[in-house]
Structure formats: C-alpha cells, structure tokens
Design a protein with these regions (language model features):
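Non-catalytic cap/lid and distal C-terminal segments of serine-dependent acyl enzymes
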Residues: 1-250, 254, 258, 263
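Hydrophobic alpha-helical segments, chiefly the membrane-spanning helices
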Residues: 264-270
C-alpha cells in the first residue's frame, strides 16, 4: 500500500491511498478519514459507497462528512466504484464499465478479469484496512448513494452481523426490474437472472431482510425516481416488518452524504 496524500482535517487525518488489488487485478485507490481518537486506539468505521461515474474523491471532497465523523470519533472509508487502468474494460455508456462496477463479481467477458468489486469491498479492502489502520472492525456501518446505496443494502443483507446499520440515499432499490440494473447485471453476470437476485435489495428484503436498522432517504422530485424504484423496497420492508425508516423529501438534496447518515451510524455504533 502506498500513501498518495495525508492532510489534517478537523483534528483528524484525511488520507488517500493506493494498493495492488488481487481481487480486481489492478491498482485500486481509496480514501480514509481517521478522527483524532484513532491516535489512541481503534475507532468504529463507516463505509460510504458512491454512485455511477464516481471515484473515491466525490463524497470525500463534496459531502462534508469529515466534520461530523470527527465530532463523533468515527472513521469513514470512501472506496472507488470500479477497477481502473488502461487494460481494464470499459464502455462508451456512463452506466457500464469504469465508474459503474455495480458492486458485483463479473462472470462475463470482457468484465470478469477485473470487475470483482463484491470481493473487493466485502473481503479484500476490509482486511487491508484492519491490518494498516486503527479501526475497530467489529463496529462497522455502511451507507451509499444511488448505485452505492444499492451496494450498501445488498452487502448488508448478504453479510449478516457485519454492519450495525445500513443507510442509503436514493438507492437503486430494485435493479432486476430497472434499466439501472438489468443492463448492468446482464453484462456482468450473464442472462441467467437467478444469479441477479443476491444483488437486488428488494428481493433480498423479501427473502431475508437485515438484522439491524435501515434508513432510506429519497427525494420525491428525483429525476431518476422511475429507475430507483423505492416504492418496491418500501413495500418489501413493510411486508417483512423490517426495522426501517423511509424518509421522503420534496427536495432532492444534491450532496451525497448528509449529517443524518453520520448521526444514524453513530447511534447504531455506540
């Protein structure tokens, strides 16, 4: 692992790091905010998974999460959304290929050699973080925006006991029935739709739910509302009697992380 930069931020440290990924078979970059409490011992960790076209930089630079994380003494990791490099397959469309890994393990060419984002987020990066930073890996929460909200929800439900809470802002909630999902799942996983189910939050909710609280924050004037399909997830949560909060707002808030996410994660991590 190599350090790209480390800067003082709200009495803590905002770092950017790169490492060779065995899962994605390329160099991967991530950002990590560590509060000052990490100098004394391990601190809880919150994951922020970003959406389509994003890198590790988007939420790190735009969200203002560091101030709130510093106030509550938690770390925040901002992974990239896909593998990178000249030899990594890509597509002319913004919603496939680089910047659009969809948090799955691709089985189809040309994506399979590098697009193993599920293994990267679920296994490789957590191990790297735990080995190199003062993090309490027994206290983790996860959140995400859009495609990242999809990833946060599916990871949380597929990895019971890993995360104390999951929060999602405008998540792609039912990708197997959406143009933001069917296209990508078919490209990465193939035409057998039975392999798609573990990557659909609505289907996972109906099957197993989540063993902790869920927060969904959705703007009702979102121009992509028909692609996100929050109503399907809301119905599944109601049927499952899931411990969940669905917040609807007339205003679609542009920043990918809100103070509410931090506060919610802190409440669940304490």
């Amino acid at each position: 692992m190599k350090t790209i930069s480390e800067n003082a931020s709200f009495r803590g440290t905002q770092g950017v790091y790169t490492h060779r990924s065995t899962a994605c078979n390329c160099d991967m970059t991530f950002a990590l905010f560590l509060p000052e409490e990490a100098q004394q011992g391990p601190v809880p960790l919150m994951w922020f998974l970003s959406g389509l076209t994003c890198t590790h930089e988007n939420a790190m630079t735009k969200a203002g999460a560091q101030a709130w994380a510093a106030e509550h003494g938690i770390a925040v990791v901002f992974p990239d959304t896909s593998p990178r490099g000249e030899d990594v397959a890509d597509d002319d469309a913004y919603d496939l290929g680089k910047g659009a890994g969809f948090y799955v393990n691709a089985t189809q060419d040309p994506w399979a050699p590098h697009f193993q984002m599920w293994d990267y987020i679920a296994d490789e990066l957590p191990a790297l973080l735990g080995e190199n930073f003062a993090l309490d890996m027994d206290r983790q929460a996860i959140c995400g925006h859009s495609m990242g909200g999809h990833g946060a929800l599916t990871l949380a439900m597929n990895l019971p006991g890993r995360f104390t809470s999951v929060s999602a802002f405008a998540p792609i909630a039912h990708p197997t029935t959406s143009d933001w999902g069917r296209k990508q799942l078919a490209a990465y996983l193939g035409s057998d739709e039975t392999t798609w189910a573990k990557h659909d939050a609505t289907l996972l909710m109906a099957e197993r739910g989540f063993d902790g609280p869920i927060l969904i924050d959705q703007g009702t004037d979102d121009q992509f509302l028909d692609l996100l399909k929050p109503e399907a997830l809301a119905e599944a949560m109601a049927k499952a009697r899931q411990n969940a909060t669905l917040r609807l707002s007339l205003i679609h808030i542009s920043e990918p992380t809100r103070p509410l996410y931090i506060s919610y994660a802190v409440f669940c991590l304490k």
